[in-house]
């Protein structure tokens, strides 16, 4: 049975401790970006599940400078525990959807902070022009740069329903160009999307096993107030996963994943004041404890059912 310290999967915490020699925390930053799915280039309503905060509901205020955002969050986190190293995580909206000189300014400012050891950027694969790729490769030579791509699913019918706005070939092209610059790529997937059963979700996992990715986020579908997804939910067009269904699904995904892929998330944090369903998702610690307990009982671990092609 494979284990990574105390966990039956290749956790981000394990990877960070190996790379940096101690526990490392992320500080969620707001670069003041928008998204082509919101500003009219592709659409105006965003992805069907996306909140008004653009998935950055826990990020700092864009009214503050990058340095001020980092310092504010470090002060808050360091009051609870001794921490010396942090990852600057640009999370809200699409964090390469801006002129390259603006991106150079904010990313360089983040990496120049003495307590920041790496940069993580959430974006879309259709927002990575050649000039931005050159910038990211340049920054990656100074400190590690990770790029998180929101794939969600490989299935085109689901992608159309959630208004993802790009083809799978676009993802593959962006991935190849990022890896040519030795930039680590994290893929964001959503479990529980309408029309996505276990087999379809595992098809996405099997596809990602064949790609040159370094990390993955397994995100539970959250129905958030004010989204178009919430309107469909309230019409009874789909139901959300219950807790046991979700844990079974996560275990399946982990068992089928390559053991080298780092697990950046196995559930998710939806803002409690916006969460409509599933309400059990707000008890994140309880969900994680149950997942670990169930995996131990079943002798389950990442890669258990992975078969190299």
Regions picked out by a protein language model, each given a short descriptive name:
Residues 1-87:
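N-terminal [4Fe-4S]-dependent radical SAM core
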Residues 104-108, 137, 197-214, 270-292:
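Short, electropositive alpha-helical surface patch
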Residues 74-77, 128-142, 173, 202-212, ...:
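Short amphipathic alpha-helices and their capping/turn segments at secondary-structure boundaries
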Residues 77-79, 106-114, 134-144, 176-180:
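Acidic (Asp/Glu)-rich catalytic clusters
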Residues 169-228, 244-267:
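Conserved C-terminal portion of the radical SAM core fold
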Residues 53-73, 77-100, 115-128, 144-170, ...:
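Core AdoMet radical
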Residues 2-14, 18, 23-25, 215, ...:
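Auxiliary Fe-S-binding modules of radical SAM enzymes
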Residues 25-29, 86-88, 119-121, 145-149, ...:
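Hydrophobic faces of well-ordered beta-strands that scaffold small-molecule active sites
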